[in-house]
């Protein structure tokens, strides 16, 4: 048992390091609405990684512009992203499958970032707008947007805006904001 646990943790750590390094090296970004194939690595003077705060930090609640409604929201994820994966798990636990639709991007992030290429068995393309790349979803928000293009994305189909792209916040949104719709009041957060 201990050996299996040790082996699993080392494999997991290796995958995360590989993923993180590749992700930050090859991932482009949107600058003033244009896809730029540049490194998005940011660091301070000492060389330590500095994460830029997300622009999309909205909440879904009865008191906000983004109200809890069935079939109003859509999730963009990659099975290659552990942060997106945990959001999918919460969606399942909170019985949101019938209320929040999902598109899965191709797991390989190439020079144009995440794609909706459907040659991966579980990638289903962009079912809302038929876009080719995930950055085009971000461009729908603003033609002058400057941001990294990440998953998961919680998308509002009604306003055509990104509600949130921080997995920890999407988890909390899913944990409580749709309770009255699903009648699932279990607290998983």
Language-model segment annotations:
Residues 23-189:
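GST-like domain detector, emphasizing the conserved glutathione-binding G-site
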């Amino acid at each position: 048992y201990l050996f299996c646990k040790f082996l699993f943790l080392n494999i997991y750590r290796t995958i995360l390091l590989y993923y993180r390094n590749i992700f930050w090296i090859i991932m482009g970004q949107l600058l003033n609405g244009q896809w730029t194939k540049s490194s998005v690595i940011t660091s301070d003077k000492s060389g330590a990684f500095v994460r830029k705060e997300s622009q999309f930090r909205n909440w879904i609640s009865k008191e906000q512009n983004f109200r809890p409604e069935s079939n109003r929201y859509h999730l963009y994820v990659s099975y290659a992203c552990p942060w997106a994966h945990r959001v999918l798990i919460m969606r399942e636990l909170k019985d949101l499958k019938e209320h929040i639709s999902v598109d899965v991007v191709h797991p390989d992030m190439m020079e144009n970032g995440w794609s909706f290429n459907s040659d991966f068995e579980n990638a289903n393309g962009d079912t809302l707008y038929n876009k080719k790349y995930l950055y085009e979803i971000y461009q729908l928000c603003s033609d002058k947007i400057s941001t990294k293009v990440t998953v998961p994305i919680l998308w509002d189909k009604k306003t055509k805006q990104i509600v949130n792209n921080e997995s920890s916040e999407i988890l909390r949104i899913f944990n409580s904001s749709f309770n009255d719709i699903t009648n699932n009041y279990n607290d998983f957060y």
